[in-house]
Amino acid sequence: MKNEKWVVAIKMLPHKIYLKTLKGCLGMLLTAFLISHFSFLISSCARMGSPDGGWYDDDPPRVIGCSPEDKATNVTSKKITIYFDEFIKLADATQNVIVSPPQLEMPEIKTQGKRIVVNLIDTLKPNTTYTVDFSDAISDNNEGNPLGNYTYTFSTGEQIDTFEGAGYVLSADKLEPIQGISVGLYDDLADSAFRTKPMLRISRTDERGHFVIKGVAPGEYRVYALQDADGDFKFSQRSEMIAFSHQTYSPSCAPDTRQDTIWRDTLHIDNIVRVPYIHFYPDDVVLLAFQELQTTRNLLKIERVQPDRFTMFFTYGDSLLPVIRGLNFDSDSAFIVESNIKKDTITYWLRDTTLINQDTLRMDLTYQMTDTLGRLVEQTDSAIEVLAKTPYEKRMKQLKKDMEEWQKEQEKLKKKDEPYDSIYPVKPLEPKYNVSSSMDPHRSILIEMPTPLASLDTAAIHLYTKIDTLWYRASYDFGRKDSTLRYYELRADWQPSREYSLEIDSAAFIDIYGLVSKEYKQGIKVKSLDDYSTLVMQMIGMSDTSVVVQLLDKSENVVQQVKAESDGSASFYYINPGVYYVRAFMDRNGNGIWDTGLYDEDVQPEDVYYYNRSIECKAKWDNTLQWNLTEFKRYLQKPGELVKQKNSKSRKKQMNRNIDRAKRLGLEYVKDIKIKK
């Protein structure tokens, strides 16, 4: 009704005013209609698309220009500017950006919005190709999409050197990829060059241990790896990790094709195409990196954490023990000396309680030390003071406090008419028995004494075995383990599926301070042969040297170790069911342990090989496997499950964000992106 009156009122107006008013009203209605429908469309689009702002940007930044131009010749400027199509960031330029030839003065590398500026400090060398390898350090500022393997090149001469050489650096002992180690070329083929000259051209390994040296001129080269501690690009410190090879390389190239995978996303392949490219050689150099044995001998420190002993720590062992001359005590027969296998850690146990209670021991100490010429010489340190960490007075206060608390506890028991003690108990000797109720037939029982023994009564050690329902004495051997001071071993002919009982009388062990061991008893059940698996590795490609073969668990711990037979076989028995791996090394000196290399003596580390897959061992199974040690190149041998240095998947994670988001919206994310592996 109101609307009808409104229309009638308009019609009653004069003709011109009527037309003008009607036109204005229609315009207002049309405007309102368009606004409401536009708002509806916007809200509908928002509901159908992305309430959180659309697809993630997974495009890497693009280089749109350089100054000087990329691959420019006759360059004299030491300032380089690289321009991008968006704001970028540079991850840890010091570690990730490599300038070759190597720069003794660190270049200044920084980002400025959409550009990177590189200022070279060293004087430019004439007629030299320079490369600035950014690897994966460049990414866009917002989403972190990496540009990937970008290298800028220029030359101070008339031409650009374009050859490349590539390969892998692995740890010599475990074939683990070494990330971030420098790899360089020398055109001086003398062994001394690595010691006296900086590398000619340089690269750095990625997380796979892979390297590519770019901008190489024609010629003959030797390749080295160096964990450069002091930044001089040569082997100048014995602690530096290195790798060397006598093989020489002459770079070359040839036309080739490769398969490229075109991915719709990280899960679906769109197409596989063959792409022509220039293949540079060599592309499979393998360098085995190691650290030399540190034979420099110095005294690191002397500690007296416990009052009854003090320990000397050396950087390297020596067969000659230090000589101690006591200044405030009689050092004759004052100690029982214990050293580790390497003889770089030596513990002196004090025999006399008077010395134990003495807070300060002053002495002259004479020992073997390496001088500035690398020779072992006799060194005497005078008036050394060895201080107890906890002073005698403080120890006595603590002992008094403990006794008072014990007395209070006994008084409480006495008042309750419960059994109590009137004599403060003497602490017993407490050996550590490494034995459990279930035992493997090939194992022995280890016993660790907390202190050196004064006496040992083997007649107080009894081993019984159960046959049918009766117990009988079983024979055993008992003695020190590997000539150590405090570790003992009980060995017996353990019969599978049989029960045993280890019984040790009290006072079987008495230490140098008069502490006495308590009675000990442990039942033992030896496992059945049906619980185990047997594995025989039949090796091909062995050298004439002794070969040690190791059975490894998933954590690469050595489960068993055997020496290979002359026919190339290595047998492992009593294997508990599980997944295992096998490693072998060429034991050139026959000492049963892997030995590192020495550069000046031209000694390579002992060769290591991995069986390239896991081995499942099941109960009651006997496995025999053929193993050609050299069938696969070293960088392909170690099973991926054992490799600690994993490949980064950040690029694929960037793409997965869009895939995950598309799934949530019920859509399909399709984008042609090449991911080169």
Segments (PLM) and residue ranges:
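Acidic, Ala/Val/Gly-enriched low-complexity intrinsically disordered segments
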Residues: 4-9, 32
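N-terminal targeting or signal-anchor segments and their processing/structural boundaries
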Residues: 8-26, 36-677
